[in-house]
């Protein structure tokens, strides 16, 4: 497999904007045509920097919505490996421990790689590796309600901590970094991950890129 046979799609937008849903929909529908081993999803969250050397008190103070919290250099390196036909060991991140864990996920080269994450489009080096990019333009109040429900139910968070983080970093960093990165998207998707027309447009674009 050479670099021309690996299509990389980036899906960005606010936390809980529908990125994972549209990524899963594309994955489920394309794998029927390509085969499960020929399409993969990489979550930008896996590349939060290792904080195992820090105390839990220090870890919870990290601004996870700032580009500096992420190791985009490692993500770029892994994408280049995969495009070159080489496997990559994707890190795993624990939302409860606020750091990476020792396990990794061994990813073999794919025909299609779907990236999803809040800050993907803020990094020009990452953008250069993408064949197409998407921004989920979901209203921020809807994103907040989804995030609150998800983090309390799935990430062992308290309602108070989620609200505090939203006020302190999530909303300000969205306005400073994430929303301005919308200008770099090839496709802007309103109404969240259940937008069927947008999903079909993205699928058609991927199929066109694969046919080149």
From Swiss-Prot:
Q: Name one GO cellular component term.
A: cytoplasm
Keyword Kinase attached = yes
Q: Which InterPro entries would you find in this protein's record?
A: P-loop_NTPase, PRK/URK, Uridine_kinase, Uridine_kinase-like
Quote the CDD domains the UniProt record gives: UMPK
GO BP: CTP salvage; UMP salvage
Q: In which pathway does it act?
A: Pyrimidine metabolism; CTP biosynthesis via salvage pathway; CTP from cytidine: step 1/3; Pyrimidine metabolism; UMP biosynthesis via salvage pathway; UMP from uridine: step 1/1
Q: Name where it's found.
A: Cytoplasm
* Class in the EC hierarchy, top level: transferase
The name under which this protein is listed is: Uridine kinase
What are this entry's molecular-function GO terms? Answer: ATP binding; cytidine kinase activity; uridine kinase activity
Quote the EC number: 2.7.1.48
Concerning its family, UniProt says:
Belongs to the uridine kinase family.
Species name for this entry? Shewanella denitrificans (strain OS217 / ATCC BAA-1090 / DSM 15013)
Q: What PANTHER family does the record point to?
A: URIDINE KINASE
């Amino acid at each position: 497999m050479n670099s021309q046979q690996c299509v990389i799609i980036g899906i960005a937008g606010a936390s809980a904007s529908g990125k994972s849903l549209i990524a899963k929909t594309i994955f489920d529908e394309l794998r029927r045509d390509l085969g499960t081993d020929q399409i993969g999803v990489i979550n930008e969250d896996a590349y939060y920097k290792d904080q195992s050397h820090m105390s839990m008190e220090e870890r919870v103070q990290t601004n996870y919505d700032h580009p500096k919290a992420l190791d985009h250099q490692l993500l770029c390196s892994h994408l280049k490996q995969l495009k070159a036909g080489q496997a990559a060991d994707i890190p795993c991140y624990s939302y409860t421990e606020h750091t990476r864990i020792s396990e990794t996920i061994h990813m073999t080269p794919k025909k299609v790689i779907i990236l999803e994450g809040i800050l993907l489009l803020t990094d020009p080096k990452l953008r250069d590796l993408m064949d197409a990019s998407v921004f989920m333009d979901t209203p921020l109040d809807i994103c907040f309600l989804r995030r609150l429900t998800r983090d309390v139910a799935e990430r062992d968070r308290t309602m108070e901590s989620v609200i505090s983080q939203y006020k302190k970093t999530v909303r300000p960093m969205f306005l400073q970094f994430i929303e301005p990165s919308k200008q770099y998207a090839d496709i802007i998707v309103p109404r969240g991950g259940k937008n069927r027309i947008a999903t079909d447009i993205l699928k058609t674009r991927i199929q066109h890129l694969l046919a080149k």
